[in-house]
């Protein structure tokens, strides 16, 4: 063995050791890198809309989750939307969205997952799925809500939560804002050197589930989204069954106001829901 090769071996070993250490750290801390909850406190629902109510959604595993409920104002049982948030913050960051959706004539349930907004527990794929099921049950049980006219709205990671819920409990319509195909694929956009498919504890495989959704689907993407590229959203809607719609908001990034309560997005949602049982006559 040459002297040069002898010197190279320790360098290779050090690089391998460092890489292994980085991978082990990421594996052990991955949920801290996926979920970014705000601990609260969260303001009252009535500070957003006068008729808003602070509510508690209880999951099957005993979690008591805080939420906001904004009932529609038309009287009787009517249409509603369940909002599944993205991976960061809490429901207060979606107040403008709640007001905008309520303005379409919908009752709105905006809740926080476990670990978010002062709620107990720690977030995980299984936990968020349980939280969404509990929220859907709560909303369906309200006297002013027609269970046959409930839409789901999912934002980013929440879109994956909404897809999973829609497979189990089909809504009247499914609206997905900035959805990805799977957590591994969106992660690969940002960390292409990591073997994410092997490392991830949570997968959110929406691309494998979307064809099993038996409801009209609207996908909305930002044309300049550098967190969840529109190409991933486009692939997801391509895998969905008809009827489906795909809307790109040009020049808009993942967290821009246009994807919170922007006119293009809201007009697309209004037109779409009017074609479904949610707002259709």
From Swiss-Prot:
Subcellular compartments: Cell membrane
Record Pfam families: Hydrolase_4
Keywords associated with the record: Cell membrane, Membrane, Transmembrane, Transmembrane helix
Record-annotated membrane-spanning stretches: 8-28, 97-117, 147-167, 210-230
Any Gene Ontology biological process: symbiont-mediated perturbation of host innate immune response
Membrane topology of this protein: Multi-pass membrane protein
The UniProt record lists the keyword Transmembrane helix: yes
InterPro entries for the chain: AB_hydrolase_fold, Hydrolase_4
Gene Ontology CC: one annotated term: plasma membrane
Family named by the database record: To S.pombe bem46 and yeast YNL320w.
Protein's UniProt name: Uncharacterized protein Rv2307c
Species per Swiss-Prot/TrEMBL record: Mycobacterium tuberculosis (strain ATCC 25618 / H37Rv)
